[in-house]
């Protein structure tokens, strides 16, 4: 079997569909999505609220079941994997950034970035060294021992970015990553996020409703009413 690192296509999605029951009615959220993202590519998933962006990220992030279609990550067909194998893919190959940071409140900035590495099996020394590197790269060298409540919103989100990149994921999924920040702070966080993603060679899918943000990515696909309707 090929190593995951040998696959140029980080993720291949074919005919992905998702529907929910609402009383006697079935609400179709995703309607047959096809998408390929290559190693190192940064993709904007553009669409208004309710278009299905978050549902799509939950599906390809292996955070929810109930989908039909095919999701292939680094050559592994997700539908054929058991829960333990899916968890291993999330841990080893995926990183997540959300609109709200979801940092652990009782852990310092440094500890929040060390934790996913320790779970993956890194030694405390390795985890600390890499966490230092990421946080320093994000201009947080003076905030390593600060707890989330002691950080500004922009600083919290930069720690969340460092945590998402801590295990050098093949694919980072970001859902409106600057949506909770003012425009100036959001621009700074996005710039630093994209710089680090490119430096690591990760691919990324960034969901946004903001065309100005989307134009900073390598490629834009537009999601409307559960369908990919255009690409540029």
UniProtKB/Swiss-Prot annotation:
Keywords: ATP-binding, Cell inner membrane, Cell membrane, Membrane, Nucleotide-binding, Translocase, Transport. ATP binds at residues 47-54. It comes from the Bacteria. Residues 11-232 form the ABC transporter domain. It is a peripheral membrane protein. Its EC number is 7.6.2.-. Signal peptide: none annotated. One of its GO terms (biological process) is lipoprotein localization to outer membrane. It is an enzyme of class 7 (translocase). It is found in: Cell inner membrane. GO terms for molecular function: ATP binding; ATP hydrolysis activity; transmembrane transporter activity. The keyword Acetylation does not apply. The keyword Plastid does not apply. GO terms for cellular component: plasma membrane. Its main location: membrane. CDD domains: ABC_MJ0796_LolCDE_FtsE (cd03255). It holds the Pfam family ABC_tran. Belongs to the ABC transporter superfamily. Lipoprotein translocase (TC 3.A.1.125) family. Part of the ABC transporter complex LolCDE involved in the translocation of mature outer membrane-directed lipoproteins, from the inner membrane to the periplasmic chaperone, LolA. Responsible for the formation of the LolA-lipoprotein complex in an ATP-dependent manner. The complex is composed of two ATP-binding proteins (LolD) and two transmembrane proteins (LolC and LolE). This is Lipoprotein-releasing system ATP-binding protein LolD. It comes from Zymomonas mobilis subsp. mobilis (strain ATCC 31821 / ZM4 / CP4). The lineage of its organism: Bacteria, Pseudomonadati, Pseudomonadota, Alphaproteobacteria, Sphingomonadales. The gene is lolD.
């Amino acid at each position: 079997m090929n190593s995951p690192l040998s696959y140029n296509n980080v993720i291949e999605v074919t005919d992905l569909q998702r529907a929910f029951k609402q009383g006697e009615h079935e609400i179709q959220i995703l309607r047959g999505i096809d998408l390929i993202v290559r190693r190192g590519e940064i993709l904007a998933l553009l669409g208004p609220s309710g278009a299905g962006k978050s549902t799509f990220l939950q599906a390809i992030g292996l955070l929810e079941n109930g989908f039909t279609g095919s999701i292939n990550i680094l050559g592994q067909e997700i539908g054929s994997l058991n829960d333990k194998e899916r968890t291993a893919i999330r841990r080893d190959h995926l990183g997540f950034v959300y609109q709200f940071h979801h940092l652990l409140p009782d852990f310092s900035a440094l500890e929040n970035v060390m934790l996913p590495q320790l779970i993956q099996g890194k030694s405390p020394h390795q985890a600390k060294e890499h966490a230092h590197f990421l946080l320093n790269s994000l201009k947080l060298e003076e905030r390593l021992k600060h707890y989330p409540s002691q950080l500004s919103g922009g600083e919290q989100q930069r720690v969340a970015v460092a945590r998402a990149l801590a295990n050098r994921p093949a694919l980072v999924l970001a859902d409106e990553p600057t949506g909770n920040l003012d425009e100036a702070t959001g621009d700074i966080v996005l710039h630093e996020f994209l710089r680090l993603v490119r430096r690591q060679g990760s691919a990324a899918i960034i969901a946004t409703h903001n065309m100005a943000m989307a134009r900073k990515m390598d490629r834009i696909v537009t999601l409307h009413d559960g369908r990919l309707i255009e690409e540029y």
